[in-house]
């Protein structure tokens, strides 16, 4: 248990931020699974639509500092490579 008031406040803030970050990361994983499912089904139109949603979610997470901006860019790049490799 923290002895200093500011440490107690930081503990409370970290708990709230942890819940928020977990929620956002879970949403990102769900969006990623949707894109991968579309890629596996060889539906390029569906994959493109799902990718737009995924890219938007990644950008928002990066803007809110849930993930680093470079990490978001790398994830978008990897997913685009999978989509472009489709027949």
Curated annotation (Swiss-Prot):
Keywords annotated in UniProt: Ribonucleoprotein, Ribosomal protein, RNA-binding, rRNA-binding
rRNA-binding in keyword set:
yes
InterPro entries documented for this protein? Ribosomal_bS20, Ribosomal_bS20_sf
What Pfam families does the record point to? Ribosomal_S20p
GO molecular-function annotation terms? Answer: small ribosomal subunit rRNA binding; structural constituent of ribosome
Q: Which GO terms describe its biological process?
A: translation
| One Gene Ontology cellular component | cytosol
Query: Signal peptide span per the entry?
Result: none
What function is annotated for this protein?
Answer: Binds directly to 16S ribosomal RNA.
Per the similarity annotation, which family is this? Belongs to the bacterial ribosomal protein bS20 family.
HAMAP family, alphabetized: Ribosomal_bS20
| Annotated protein name in UniProt | Small ribosomal subunit protein bS20
Whose protein is this, by species?
A: Brachyspira hyodysenteriae (strain ATCC 49526 / WA1)
Corresponding gene?
Answer: rpsT
């Amino acid at each position: 248990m923290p002895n200093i008031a500011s440490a107690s406040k930081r503990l409370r803030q970290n708990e709230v931020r942890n819940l928020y970050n977990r929620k956002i990361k879970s949403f990102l994983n769900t969006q990623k699974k949707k894109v991968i499912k579309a890629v596996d089904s060889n539906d390029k139109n569906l994959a493109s639509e799902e990718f737009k949603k995924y890219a938007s979610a990644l950008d928002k997470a990066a803007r809110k500092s849930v993930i680093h901006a470079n990490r978001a860019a790398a994830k978008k790049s990897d997913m685009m490579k999978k989509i472009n490799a489709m027949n």
